[in-house]
From Swiss-Prot:
Presence of keyword ATP-binding: no
Places the protein is found: Cell membrane
Protein name: Uncharacterized protein YwnF
TM region positions: 31-53, 63-80
Keyword terms of this UniProt record: Cell membrane, Membrane, Transmembrane, Transmembrane helix
GO CC term (a single one): plasma membrane
Membrane topology note: Multi-pass membrane protein
Length: 144
């Protein structure tokens, strides 16, 4: 989801996007932190572990170092997996928000609301359908 284009959108869409952004902000913060930790930690550890395995001897001190690098690599990969889980939570939260927003609409008919809800459930990136819904709702609101 690209929140950078929000500033170019009409006010009624901008308001809804800001509400979505506010709902997913805690998940986005966690995702950024986990990825920020995961990538350097895993890359550093895996690189050192690979270099260590090719150039080190098999004494006790070397095995402890290898174990530490393996543990750090596993930690980095776990952070990366958690970042992926947080990203899925973001998508789920956005979908739930959009579906609830469509259900709450008092301007569109039940048929149109169910059509938009179906489109959002079927599309992997449903933002376009949600923007169409908001545009149609605003257009009908101005008519009445």
């Amino acid at each position: 989801m690209n929140f950078y284009r929000v500033e170019q959108m009409p006010g009624f869409i901008k308001t809804e996007m800001q509400k979505i952004q506010k709902a997913v902000q805690p998940f986005m913060k966690k995702t950024v932190i986990y990825r920020f930790l995961a990538i350097p930690l895993a890359a550093f550890s895996l690189f050192n572990l690979a270099a260590f395995l090719f150039h080190a001897s098999a004494d006790r001190e070397s095995l402890i170092s290898a174990g530490i690098f393996a543990l750090l690599a596993a930690l980095g990969l776990a952070f990366f997996k958690e970042a992926g889980y947080q990203h899925k939570q973001i998508q789920k939260t956005v979908h739930i928000y959009m579906l609830n927003r469509i259900k709450k609409s008092e301007i569109l008919s039940e048929e149109r609301k169910s059509s938009y809800a179906r489109q959002i459930k079927e599309e992997p990136f449903a933002m376009r359908s949600f923007v169409e819904f908001l545009t149609e709702e605003d257009r009908r609101k101005k008519m009445y």
